Structures are given as structure tokens and as C-alpha cells.
Design a protein with these regions (language model features):
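Classical Sec-dependent N-terminal signal peptides that target proteins to the secretory pathway
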Residues: 1-21
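A short, hydrophobic, proline-anchored segment that marks a local hinge/packing element in signaling
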Residues: 108-115
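N-terminal targeting sequences that direct proteins away from the cytosol to non-cytosolic compartments
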Residues: 17-84, 90-91, 114, 124-153
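Short, Gly/Ser/Thr-enriched beta-strand-loop segments that form substrate-interacting elements
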Residues: 83-107
């Protein structure tokens, strides 16, 4: 493959070689992202049917799909090593009422306040991972999260 690219670069000029390499890398990234999203959607569909289990997350009991977990570093829901398009955030000592975004976003947002602690949950609205959005809606409902009404883009 590299020899073919090198031959093409020689034929069309050296300055185009960077552009071709860049296009190839962008193409690889696109197909890798597509593969990840397809896997996320498949897992989301599977988890919609699974039973839930209670976990303790930042001093709050949460019901999430069985055998899934919340990544401690980035807050994403994970199953079988795959991060889904569902993210949790914890904000201690949140005293004001500015919780939801004022503008429409490309993700849905839910919140739950307890004492002066704020628990947030987000789910991206990607067309290719709709099952993750449905799973997030189910998790939000089961755990008493309130949906922000800022709307999706």
C-alpha cells in the first residue's frame, strides 16, 4: 500500500503527498469511529434488555445495567470494556440554580440534586447510537433524574 502511495506521489508531485497521507488518515479515523459507534449501539440495545443492579457512585445509589460500570476518570458508562455515549458528572457544593444549559445542545442532559450535591447525566444524540439515548432515558427514569428542557439541536 505504501509503495502505491509513493508511486502516486511521485507521479503527481511531492507536495500532494502530505494531502494524500492526510486523507488516508482521515478515512481510517472515520471508519474506526463508525465501527466504535456501531458497537456502542449494539451494546446499548443489549443493555436495554438487561436487568439492573444497584451501585454506589459518589455517595448516591444508582441503578445501572447489570455488569456495567461508571468509569472513575471520565464518568462514562462502560460495558465489557466499551465506553458508551452516556456520561455522569458529580458536582459537590452546588448552591445556585444554574444547572441546565440555556441553549439547545447536541446531547440530552438530566440532573438530580441531593443536599448541596449535583449529579448530572448526559447522552449524545448521535444518529448511529440511538440505543444509547434510549438507555440513558431509562437510567434517568429509574434513578429519578430530571430532564433539562433546553432541547436538542
Amino acid at each position: 500500500m505504501k509503495k502505491i502511495i509513493l508511486l502516486i506521489c511521485i507521479l503527481i508531485g511531492v507536495s500532494s503527498c502530505d494531502m494524500i497521507a492526510e486523507d488516508i488518515q482521515e478515512s481510517k479515523n472515520y471508519f474506526e469511529d463508525k465501527k466504535i459507534r456501531k458497537n456502542q449501539n449494539k451494546i446499548g440495545l443489549e443493555l436495554l434488555e438487561k436487568n439492573t443492579e444497584k451501585i454506589l457512585w459518589n455517595r448516591m445509589e444508582l441503578r445501572i445495567p447489570k455488569n456495567s460500570k461508571i468509569n472513575e476518570v471520565n464518568g462514562r458508562l462502560e460495558y465489557d470494556g466499551q465506553a458508551l455515549e452516556i456520561e455522569f458528572k458529580y458536582i459537590p457544593n452546588k448552591n445556585n440554580d444554574d444547572i441546565c444549559f440555556d441553549v439547545s445542545t447536541s446531547f440530552k442532559e438530566w440532573y438530580k440534586k441531593r443536599n448541596n450535591e449535583l449529579y448530572l447525566m448526559y447522552s449524545n444524540n448521535f444518529q448511529s447510537t440511538k440505543s444509547n439515548m434510549r438507555l440513558a432515558e431509562k437510567i434517568a427514569k429509574e434513578n429519578g433524574f430530571i430532564e433539562c428542557k433546553n432541547g436538542l439541536i
